Amino acid sequence: MQENFFDKLLDLGKEWSIERVEFDEQINEIDIYVRFNLDTYKEKSGDTYHGVYDYREYRRWRHLDILQYKCFIKAKIPRLIAQDGKIYSLDVPWADLGSRHTFLFERFAIDVLLATKNQTKTSQLLRCGFNVINHIIHAASERGVLRRDKSILYKQLSVDEKSHKANHQYVTVPKLPRYGKYNRYC
């Protein structure tokens, strides 16, 4: 019953299902263990499936809180054999490669950051470290730059020098005046 509830709540697709849910009352955390459904993956892959090499150790991703408890998704990621015999890790549908946070957590962190306009306050509200929020900002910025139309990115560019508290430390601020947007990747 409990696993069905989380299956519907997380909506991870048919290739992944909830194995079990553990609650640690001492540290107020919920771990949702997710299992890879190999048979479903085989059906979907057809001729491109060449076997599972092994499974990585459990990885843990921070997810949106459930009530007042921190929530984490834990899963063993399968390493598959490619057609050419090389081994690769399967991408998970809830997070980017190498990320320790789910897409939903990152999106919520950005929403909170836009509301607070303060990284420290955002990290306090989400009960995570300042570095976590900083990493999420940089990852979101990089994804945004990749989605931009490259043909309009450099048609017109303004550059401004800003000093910090009159102590002669300057920051160069590139801006796209036509769109009113700052561009940190010039």
Regions found by a protein language model. Name each.
Residues Y41-E43, D91-V92, K121, N167, ...:
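Short helix/loop capping segments that flank catalytic or ligand/cofactor-binding pockets
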Residues T120-I136:
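Short, basic interhelical loop/turn and adjoining N-cap
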Residues I32, T102-K117:
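Short, amphipathic alpha-helical "recognition" segments used to contact nucleic acids or chromatin
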Residues H135-C186:
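RNase H-like nuclease fold core
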Residues N37, R127-C128, K162, P177:
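An acidic- and aromatic-residue-enriched active-site/binding cleft used to recognize and process polar
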Residues K86-R107:
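Short, Lys/Arg-enriched anionic-surface-contact patches
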Residues I32, E43-G46, A82, A109, ...:
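Mobile genetic element proteins and their domesticated derivatives, centered on retroelements
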Residues M1-L90:
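Short, conserved DNA-binding cores of transcription-related domains
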